[in-house]
């Protein structure tokens, strides 16, 4: 079940625009980027999706000369499908192939009749060279970046069947909010704080109403998040990042001295890990 997101309108406006630069959809893992693009794909007659993480070998299509005609031919052979004018081409997990990021420039310059969206997480590490030791030749001015986030409270209300309350929230200035409406908003907000804004958890709550099931989803997401720590930097071990992450989650809103926060972790590495975690989000 796809729950409508606020970004859907932005993506649709991009489709309708005469000058549609390739899009880079950025955001933390599992915030709904892929689902949003697949939902948009229903507005296109032809759609091709390639995932550079699931199919690492497909990245070879972008090796060598970035000749768009040759790249399109390779894609057509790979998918056994013609790529004609108006096709939506979705390059998912593009951070796995820096060369594909550079290629977006030439999609814009040489094949403007195609609609191209790239999505990825941890892109900041690739763009500054922290992952591959070499900064990416980013196509400045030839692409448009959009940041996607987890569900907002308004999106949560719409997704859980509280459309009337969501519309009320959108149009009220809270100067004359009836007590019953205010109380209902508070109750729903408490639920939102518990369920969170990750799409899988919101979908689970909308379908089952089970907070316990949502908490299991949260645990799975955190484990997956930690599994990515080895991708953050070659200059700090994943174990140190994990220690700082665990420390931070238990000291929210508290004052901390980085020099004495965690035994065995210097102020330099503590601050470095905090910066890496912020960049990942």
Predicted regions and their residues:
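N-terminal pre-Walker A segment at the start of P-loop NTPase domains
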Residues: 1-16
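Hydrophobic anchor at the beta1->P-loop junction of P-loop NTPases
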Residues: 25
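Conserved lysine of the Walker
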Residues: 33
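Hydrophobic positions on the alpha1 helix immediately C-terminal to the Walker A/P-loop
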Residues: 36, 40
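Short glycine-rich substrate-engagement loop in P-loop NTPases that contacts/grips substrate
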Residues: 54-85
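Structural recognition of the conserved hydrophobic beta-strand(s) that form the central parallel beta-sheet
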Residues: 90, 115-121, 147
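Short regulatory helix/loop adjacent to the ATP-binding pocket of P-loop NTPases
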Residues: 124-144, 157-162
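Interdomain hinge/linker elements that couple catalytic modules in large macromolecular machines
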Residues: 158-281
């Amino acid at each position: 079940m796809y729950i409508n997101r606020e970004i859907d309108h932005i993506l649709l406006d991009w489709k309708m625009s005469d000058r549609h630069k390739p899009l880079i959809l950025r955001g933390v893992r599992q915030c709904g980027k892929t689902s949003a693009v697949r939902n948009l794909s229903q507005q296109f007659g032809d759609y091709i999706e390639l995932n550079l993480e699931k199919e690492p070998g497909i990245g070879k299509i972008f090796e060598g000369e970035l000749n768009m005609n040759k790249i399109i031919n390779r894609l057509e052979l790979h998918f056994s499908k013609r790529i004609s004018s108006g096709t939506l081409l979705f390059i998912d997990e593009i951070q796995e192939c820096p060369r594909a990021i550079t290629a977006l420039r030439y999609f814009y310059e040489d094949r403007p009749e195609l609609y191209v969206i790239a999505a990825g997480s941890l892109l900041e590490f690739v763009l500054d060279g922290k992952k591959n030791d070499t900064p990416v030749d980013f196509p400045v001015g030839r692409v448009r970046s959009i940041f996607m986030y987890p569900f907002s409270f308004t999106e949560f209300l719409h997704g859980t069947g509280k459309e009337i309350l969501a519309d009320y929230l959108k149009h009220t200035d809270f100067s004359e909010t009836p007590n019953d409406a205010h109380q209902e908003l508070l109750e729903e907000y408490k639920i939102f704080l518990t369920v969170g804004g990750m799409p899988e958890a919101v979908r689970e709550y909308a379908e089952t109403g089970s907070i316990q099931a949502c908490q299991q989803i949260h645990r799975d997401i955190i484990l997956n998040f930690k599994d990515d720590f080895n991708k953050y930097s070659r200059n700090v071990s994943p174990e140190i990042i994990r220690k700082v992450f665990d420390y931070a989650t238990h000291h929210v809103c508290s004052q901390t001295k980085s020099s004495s926060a965690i035994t065995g972790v210097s102020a330099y590495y503590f601050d470095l890990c905090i910066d890496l975690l912020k960049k990942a989000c």
